[in-house]
Every structure is written in C-alpha cells, then in structure tokens.
C-alpha cells in the first residue's frame, strides 16, 4: 500500500538560495525619443505589425503597451513602498465599473502628453486619432458602475492605498 503522506515537490534549483535579481532594471525614460522607440518595438515585435498596417486599433495597442510599461514601474514602486511601511489598505468590490476611456488621463498622469504627441508626429500619426480608437472600458450599465469608477479615480488621485475588484463577465449585462 502506498504511503498516504503527500510529499511536496522539490523546489527547482533556481528557487533555492537568494532570489535572482531579475527586476533590477533602469527606469524607462519618458522623453519623446524613448517613447517612440518603445512604441516601434511593441508595434513590430509584440503585435507583429509592419509599416503597411494602417489599422488604428494596432497603433492604439502599441501606444497603450508603451504607456503600460511605464505605469507598471510606478505601480511596483508604490506597492513596495506601501508594503515596507506596513500601510493598511482598503479593498473595494463592485459588480460593475464604468471607467470610460483612460488614454488621455494616463498621458496626463505620466506627464508625457507632449512627448507622446511629438513621438507620434515623427511616426506620421496623430494622438487624437489614437485617442478616438480607444475602446470604452465600461463594465456594467448604470450609475453604480460610474460611482465605483469615480471612487477609485478619487482614491488614486489622493494616493490612497485602495484596490478595486470586480467580476469579469463575457455575456450580457447584470
């Protein structure tokens, strides 16, 4: 009869000892030239598009990924600061969020609106065209979803340690 105790699998050799320093990277630059190069990288290598692609959706996606990488740096630094200070956090759960479009707000919060405008101009694109290509990120159908979005946006503006949670659903509305 086999032994009834369950032995955990052995940890991989890479997980033993000190943690590998894979996240120690220089901060991403916010200047126009760096934004342009990262945009081109995401457009060509991540999305697999070339100069013949005229679909604004892919251009919007490349810009969103470029900005997301910069937001992730700030997000990780914020989490580390809250964790090291043992800050209490609030968690907000809602069945719906009507966040709306976020591109222009993200550009403003990162302080890269002018740099992005210049980078896109150098690539033959207009920021306004990409802003119009952004899909609406609404999840829900009413006032409570808008209230939830406003609450989280206010918390972010005030730099409060709040996370929002929701249900992701694919078919229909609540």
How would you describe each model-predicted region?
Residues 2-174:
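A conserved ligand/cofactor-binding region detector
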């Amino acid at each position: 009869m086999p032994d009834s105790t369950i032995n955990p699998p052995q940890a991989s050799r890479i997980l033993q000892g000190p943690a590998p320093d894979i996240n120690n990277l220089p901060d991403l630059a916010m200047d126009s030239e760096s934004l342009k190069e990262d945009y081109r990288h995401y457009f060509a290598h991540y999305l697999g598009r070339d100069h013949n692609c005229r679909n604004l959706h892919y251009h919007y996606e490349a810009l969103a990924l470029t900005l997301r990488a910069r937001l992730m740096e700030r997000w990780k630094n914020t989490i580390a600061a809250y964790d090291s200070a043992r800050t209490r956090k609030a968690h907000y759960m809602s069945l719906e969020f009507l966040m709306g479009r976020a591109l222009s707000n993200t550009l403003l919060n990162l302080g890269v609106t002018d740099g992005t405008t210049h980078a896109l101009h150098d690539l033959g694109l207009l920021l306004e065209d990409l802003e119009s290509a952004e899909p609406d990120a609404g999840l829900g159908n009413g006032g409570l979803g808008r209230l939830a979005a406003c609450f989280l946006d206010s918390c972010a503006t005030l730099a409060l340690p709040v996370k929002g949670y929701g249900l992701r659903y694919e078919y229909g509305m609540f």
